[in-house]
Amino acid sequence: WIMGHMVNAIYQTDEFVNLGANSIETDVSFDDNANPEYTYHGIPCDCGRSCLKWENYNDFLKGLRSATTPGNSKYQSKLILVVFDLKTGSLYDNQASEAGKKLAKNLLKHYWNNGNNGGRAYIVLSIPDLNHYPLIKGFTDTLKQEGHPELLEKVGYDFSGNDAVGDVAKAYKKAGVSGHVWQSDGITNCLLRGLTRVKEAVANRDSGNGYINKVYYWTVDKRATTRDALDAGVDGVMTNYPDVIADVMNEAAYKNKVRLATYEDSPWVTFKK
């Protein structure tokens, strides 16, 4: 999965997919009442990027639905996965469940079209704080209550705080999650970060009894870092430059080892070599 980083304006979706991304990451900010409000990152953000692009969250979802609904004039068949980077740092811990409920209702209405031929992309809810694990239950319970438990087949989870792998496992246990787990590791492109924890996450994924299904590394903009990440065995790379990642994947060392994921590749099934 080549994951376009910080895609917060609707027009950027096409831009990133046309450069080679089959997945995008979008920031979601919340208002004081835990309503998802804007797709907005703000300052500071990655070096070399504008931090201030934004849409109303519901408008973004409608645009995303168009881009991921076959038959729509704006349909992009390559776009198969969307990571919502949930900026829950602005919320009190006791609002996490409420944020999950509201997120579920927004997605159900504006993205899934109330279960009636909505967008087809897989969704990853990425949460920065392990204490906000109740967001997951708020989300899953709401989809069930609204009569659409089948849509949970399209939803996965990520804790993005670079916490110890064992602590992340405990948070999932509390949230009642087994499966559909992506594990992120990374840092802004302005700084360097080694691959120690990525390798630990990959080992958990491949152990046969770990909690992780897929591992992604962010933010990767350089060819050398891309090679290191691919060598470490990641499933996804989040980047500001999808074309760079696509180029590296076409190099002799990689072109027979890795390929771009398609819609038929389940993002929840651990790849067995």
From Swiss-Prot:
State whether keyword Glycoprotein applies.
Answer: no
Instruction: Tell me the Gene3D superfamilies matching this sequence.
Output: Phosphatidylinositol (PI) phosphodiesterase
Explain how, and how many, cofactor molecules are bound: Binds 1 Mg(2+) ion per subunit.
Q: Which UniProt keywords apply?
A: Cytolysis, Dermonecrotic toxin, Disulfide bond, Hemolysis, Lipid degradation, Lipid metabolism, Lyase, Magnesium, Metal-binding, Secreted, Toxin
Tissue specificity is:
Expressed by the venom gland.
Its subcellular locations are: Secreted
| Primary location | secreted
Here the disulfide bonds are 45-51, 47-190
Protein name in UniProt: Dermonecrotic toxin LhSicTox-alphaIA2avii
